């Protein structure tokens, strides 16, 4: 991917291995920026390796991601290596926003500790190999406010061939919403941690951003 984007080999350090069980960057400094699209709902060893619950990446949440769904294990891994003033943007399978049990406990840890800066709902059919409408979770450690921005960007795309694509204009509108951090009817909502708690730590964008009613209004009297 680096070579395809013409990034000189001297500017990156790539390691081959299992990120979750054999991380290759233990000796590195925390990262100021992390961008990731980890595999969706892949399997991992999870609780079968009892040592992992004491791993400094996963221990703070008090629970491991399910063996059948490693999504939030990757999220915790990245949070661990995020600098105090850094930002992480992670493309996630939508289930991580609402599934219960261990994943619900990890979401609670992330929200209660004010790490979740924004959740962005993306359009469906953006990525090769899946038509799923994924989302982006934006994490920060040093945040001045205690609220989460929810952005519905599900319509921010154009159809090209058999896939949807984010144009430069689509990307800029999404970035502007995140940077301005204000409520916009049917598009963005700024939600307090208390309100998220009352909603059982659900982070689905549709739970907080009401879609616009585009149905045609019919005057019964005129009919």
Predicted regions and their residues:
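S-adenosyl-L-methionine
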Residues: 1-28
